[in-house]
Amino acid sequence: LMTGVESARDAYIAKPHNCVYECFDAFSSYCNGVCTKNGAKSGYCQILGTYGNGCWCIALPGNVPIRIPGKCHR
């Protein structure tokens, strides 16, 4: 049993101001790099998702910001 571990979730990783990391190639390694650099197990480019084309992370740590409903304030 592990203690003190933040919960992980699958979600769009967010930049500051509630914006997704945009991507344009579902087969690129860009999103996997962004996600794993932030502690996720993996990631990929979700094309035409809820927030357009954005990086979706698998098992992203709970302390990393995710895209939430509302505007992206660039």
From Swiss-Prot:
Pro-piece positions: 74
Protein localization: Secreted
Keywords: Disulfide bond, Ion channel impairing toxin, Neurotoxin, Secreted, Signal, Toxin, Voltage-gated sodium channel impairing toxin
Cysteine pairs bridged by disulfides in the record: 19-72, 23-45, 31-55, 35-57
InterPro entries, per the entry: LCN-type_CS_alpha_beta_dom, Scorpion_toxin-like, Scorpion_toxin-like_sf, Scorpion_toxinL, Scorpion_toxinL/defensin
One record GO biological process: defense response
Secretion signal, residue range per the UniProt entry: 1-7
Source organism, top-level taxon: Eukaryota
Disulfide bond recorded as keyword: yes
Tissue: Expressed by the venom gland.
Domain free text: Has the structural arrangement of an alpha-helix connected to antiparallel beta-sheets by disulfide bonds (CS-alpha/beta).
General function of this protein: Alpha toxins bind voltage-independently at site-3 of sodium channels (Nav) and inhibit the inactivation of the activated channels, thereby blocking neuronal transmission.
Family affiliation: Belongs to the long (4 C-C) scorpion toxin superfamily. Sodium channel inhibitor family. Alpha subfamily.
Protein name: Sodium channel neurotoxin MeuNaTxalpha-6
Annotated organism of origin: Mesobuthus eupeus
